[in-house]
Amino acid sequence: MIQQIDAPLREDVRLLGNLLGETLKQHAGQDLFNQIEQIRALAKGARDGQAETEKKLEQLFLDLKDEEILPLTRAFSYFLNFANIAEQYHVVRSRRRSEFDEQGPPPNPLIHLFEKFKQNQISSKQLFQQVSNLSIELVLTAHPTEVSRRTLIQKYDDINEGLSKLDQQKLTPRERQQVLDDLKQLICSAWQTDEIRQNKPTPLDEAKWGFTTIEQTLWNAVPKFVRELDTLVHQHCDAHLPLDISPIRFASWMGGDRDGNPNVTHNVTQEVLWLSRWQAADLYLRDIEDLRWELSIQACSEELSQTLGRRHPEPYREYLRSTRERLKATRQWLSLRLQGLDGDDSQIIRHKQELLDPLLLCHRSLMECNLPEIANGKLLDFIYRVNCFGIELLKLDIRQESGRHRQAISAITEYLGLGNFESWTEQARQNFLIQELQSKRPLLPKYLNEPEGSLIEHPDVKEVFATMRTLAEQPPESLGAYIISMAEYASDVLAVLLLQKEAGILQPLRVVPLFETLKDLDGAAKTMETLFNMHWYKQHIQGKHEVMIGYSDSAKDAGFMSANWAQYRAQEELTAVAKSHGVQLTLFHGRGGSISRGGAPTQQALFSQPPGSISGAIRVTEQGEMIRFKFGLEGVALQNLEIYTAATLEATLLPPPVPKQEWRDLMHQMTDISVRVYRETVRENPHFVQYLRTVTPELELQMLPLGSRPAKRKVSGGIESLRAIPWVFAWTQIRLMLPAWLGTGAAINQVIDENKKAVLDEMLAEWPYFQTLIDMLEMVLSKSDANIALYYESHLTDNEDLKILGEMLRQRLNDAVQTLLSMKGESKLLSKNDVLDQAMQVRKPYLLPLHLLQAELMKRRRLYTAQSNAERTPVDHALMVSIAGIAAGLRNTG
């Protein structure tokens, strides 16, 4: 069954599995090893359809003592993590292999795409202009689905490095044995490490994790990528890219996203901003030391000589000395600030240009002296890095919920004796905000002396004001966008602009409304039209605007298909409104790893957006565990930078067709059915919330120290109070995957029954948007397993009402699978995606025991808490390991 998987990948999986086995024998005993082998054999039998083997497994787990479960869950969890490592390294290996194969397809998708542009009569001038103006920004967010500890991630990276060494042809037997010994030592060290964090990460921990990704992979991958791009452009357009090119940049929400996270305060934001600049200065200092070592050349231009003011035997080294000293001063000053101390800031670097100008002068001089090899060596890499990472490493976005801003403005209006802003009509709010934005005077005195109970003294209001004052003190280059979550009205955007003005922010952050519920997505274009019609606002934005489309909350609100179509329509309408007002629109996609959070292969996801909606500019969130999968290894990071660039260029220069009216009508019909079925189940079934809390580990997930934010917006309440990410995570753990297919299968089935299969076939053949939607549905259905979901249910509840609901949900899951197969005319899922199918087949013998163990652990934990009311129980650790292991095995968590 595993034969179709690439032999080298199979060998790596086997090697890591064997080394883990040896470690277990040595450190956990032969008995445990034998037990694991027995369980693995039974699980393989169960995978291949032998019903009696699953029964044996169940009995075996029932008989285990509490303390016997932890080593088992750890062993299976580690195997799944090692399979991921092998797969991730295999991407790098395959890429290298394809570079040797001149007959095969090129590893870089841009090579094929540039040929396609030529065939489609895209002129070299048009292509050059488009590449030069590309603006892709990837925004790293710490969504709480990265369940692996950073300590272990480092060991996993070292294991990757070991696999890479084993691939080298010229290792001597002794060298090869040394690599194997190193791998064994790493696996032994991982086994002896607790894979579960003891404490939730702080927002500062999350931010440091983002900086680590930059330092370890992107710092080298970015200049390599820009060089590749420049070579390609030169081949096809006979011109080199401008030196200030930066097609891809990075931003972050870690330490800036305060929506629903009381742990992100203005002090935390300040600390993260300083730390980010410190990290950048530190990395540039290493680079400049390297560069000064290389630039021992005597020959220099008249311009450089005059700037130095004298002749010098090593002009470049001498000239860059002051830049090095300024970087040291910057790092030292930031170090002091992080310790709460003041220091001399007269020499610090405050703007990117202060770092770039000396580098560009050196480059001009070397080119003038006919030394392009040196000019375009380490120096050019340095220039590309400064273009991409600036003085801040990652621009920090700020995100806050619209209600907090309304509350803050209400505090101001109440203080001024104007009443409560929140109770005014929308028109009255807009009038007040525009009037005050045009006024030269401040609204509030510098010092307030109000009684304690007044709104202006409310801690939440004071925190909003304090955050704005903190932003006013930063170099503008350190900051990205100010995002308003749950944006509904034009006044939501104006309110943030007024709060920025009141705090004295001289270069206001661009304000980005985030539309995320079905209702807000449907009203998004109208809201933006209202803003664009305001003379003051139109002048303020200077022809550019950014709007964020939310994926998670809309899918939780309406189901995958309805949310997906609402997002598509909102983008179409926003693109049209912006165009009619002459505004250049950038859409910011709040995607995640799972499909109900917009997760899809990048190229497919971007090409399936509405035509015209990606016009050379895009922002996308990279969330939680996806950061590690996409950027954790330099080779994989490089590939993902190429894919983003190719996808953005293709969607811009060769956009997909405008969907036919017949297709749109059918999508409307299907989404109406889909949202009705979804909400009938999720919102109207009186037993649904109880089912979620009983059968899935939704409540137990809150124990896992995942991200720095609470799993719920409010402590009590139903589905509405649950964050979108734990919502997806919980259903994924029991393999029901409900958010992704509920309602969608029923909708497709109904239109097939109405003899509209021919239209569906046409949509599938000709419309990239619909192809992606169906591919994503198929991928998630292939990871679902009704039998595993039934096992959790039968193990965890005797309630007849819940069993009836569970039966209905599993039936609907099976119906969705059958509907998809009949629509595609295929007999099994993933019949055209062998790689994913095989990856799941390999994982099944390791996932099944973890699921059965998890159900048993949940049962035991609930018994303990019912008996003693204790917060901690003897099975907590094993339960958390099972949650992390299943997340690793399925590769998309929340």
UniProtKB/Swiss-Prot annotation:
User: What's in the keyword line of the UniProt record?
Assistant: Carbon dioxide fixation, Lyase, Magnesium
Pfam families in the cross-refs: PEPcase (PF00311)
Which Gene3D superfamilies does this chain map to?
Answer: Phosphoenolpyruvate/pyruvate domain (1.20.1440.90)
Q: Which co-factor is required?
A: Mg(2+)
One GO cellular component term noted in the UniProt record for this chain: cytosol
Question: Where along the chain is the active site annotated?
Answer: H143, K556
Q: Does the keyword Repeat apply?
A: no
Q: What is its EC number?
A: 4.1.1.31
Q: Which domain of life is it from?
A: Bacteria
Q: What class of enzyme is it?
A: lyase
Molecular-function annotations in GO: magnesium ion binding; phosphoenolpyruvate carboxylase activity
Q: Which processes are annotated in GO (biological process)?
A: carbon fixation; oxaloacetate metabolic process; tricarboxylic acid cycle
Q: Does the keyword RNA-binding apply?
A: no
Chemical reaction(s) catalysed: oxaloacetate + phosphate = phosphoenolpyruvate + hydrogencarbonate
PANTHER family to which the protein is assigned, alphabetical? PHOSPHOENOLPYRUVATE CARBOXYLASE
Member of which family?
Belongs to the PEPCase type 1 family.
Tell me, in a sentence or two, what this protein's role is. Forms oxaloacetate, a four-carbon dicarboxylic acid source for the tricarboxylic acid cycle.
Name this protein carries in UniProt: Phosphoenolpyruvate carboxylase
Q: Which organism is it from?
A: Acinetobacter baylyi (strain ATCC 33305 / BD413 / ADP1)
